[in-house]
């Protein structure tokens, strides 16, 4: 079985890199730098980047980068893919250089989401210094945060994530837009770290290629300060401040320049998976998180 350590990075596309530069620095509080082949690195911790932004005609999320522990773990992952008859493509020299890793293998899940398996990230030993004074983001061995991806082919995609990529179920949400409507499934998955979920799948298509990605800060004060910066910069709000029921994250949602949402939160659960029981929860949040504000814009 493949053992993924966490969400190492994501790749997104935008028409003008300066839009992401302003958003990262002025709203998220993350410094940026130039990436090879003309992209933009967005830095969250001691690594050179956690978000790779490239320029293109379409605003969208392009890929999720999943970290493996070693060359041996990467080789084992390729063996698993071959044994399962899963098509993969090894990353080009340009892709490996741009992502700053030792090796890369690309797989596409049954809903069309691109997953990049990688190992051996490059480090420049430069500290994280926020342009907005954010002390730190909660990353480390839990990865950059989480990503929620569209899965219109839900059963096949969930099976792929669990049986091929090695993710395990954290919790289940069956969303009903109205009491008589059929349930829309959203399943939350974890990997080899304590974060409640590093990946989730939602049973519907999303034009931008991602429902949302999440980043976590280490205090509620920093969530509030980011909320103020969002308002000051005129960034579209997607959901009001609230606290989720499943992972207890207190957060708000806003739109990125690539068209998908970003959740900015504090206080997400870190779990001992040997003692965890899967929960089906019946509401998104304990309080707040009014998503109708995003639909009104």
Outline where the language-model segments fall:
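N-terminal beta-strand motif that seeds the catalytic metal site of vicinal oxygen chelate
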Residues: 1-18, 61-66, 122-156, 168-170, ...
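Core segments of cupin and vicinal oxygen chelate
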Residues: 2-49, 149-196
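Short, structured motif recognition centered on aromatic/hydrophobic residues
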Residues: 4-10, 24, 30, 42, ...
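Conserved donor-binding loop and adjoining core beta-sheet/short helix segment
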Residues: 34-69, 92-94
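Short, charged/polar, Gly/Pro-enriched secondary-structure boundary elements
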Residues: 47-52, 112-115, 195-199, 260-261
């Amino acid at each position: 079985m493949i053992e993924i350590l966490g969400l190492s990075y994501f790749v997104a596309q935008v028409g003008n890199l300066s839009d992401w530069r302003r958003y990262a620095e002025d709203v998220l509080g993350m410094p940026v730098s130039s990436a090879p082949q003309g992209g933009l690195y967005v830095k969250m911790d001691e690594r050179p980047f956690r978000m790779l932004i490239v320029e293109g005609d379409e605003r969208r999320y392009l890929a999720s980068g999943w970290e493996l522990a070693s060359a041996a773990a990467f080789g084992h992952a390729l063996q698993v893919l071959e044994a399962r008859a899963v098509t993969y493509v090894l990353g080009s020299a340009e892709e490996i250089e741009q992502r700053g890793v030792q090796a890369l293998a690309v797989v596409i899940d049954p809903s069309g989401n691109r997953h990049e398996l990688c190992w051996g990230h490059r480090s420049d030993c430069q500290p994280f210094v926020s342009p907005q004074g954010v002390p730190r983001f909660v990353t480390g061995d839990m990865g950059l945060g989480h990503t929620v991806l569209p899965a219109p082919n839900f059963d096949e995609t969930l099976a792929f994530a669990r049986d091929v990529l090695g993710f395990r179920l954290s919790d289940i949400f069956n969303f009903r837009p109205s009491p008589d409507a059929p349930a829309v499934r959203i399943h939350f998955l974890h990997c080899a770290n304590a974060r409640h979920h590093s990946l989730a799948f939602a049973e519907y298509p999303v034009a931008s290629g991602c429902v949302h990605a999440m980043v976590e800060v280490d205090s509620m004060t920093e969530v509030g300060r980011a909320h103020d910066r969002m308002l000051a910069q005129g960034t579209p709000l997607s959901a009001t401040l609230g606290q989720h029921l499943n992972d207890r994250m207190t957060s708000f949602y806003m739109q990125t320049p690539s068209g998908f949402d970003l959740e900015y939160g504090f206080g997400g659960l870190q779990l001992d998976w040997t003692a965890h029981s899967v929960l089906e929860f019946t509401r998104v949040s304990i309080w707040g998180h009014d998503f109708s504000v995003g639909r009104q814009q």
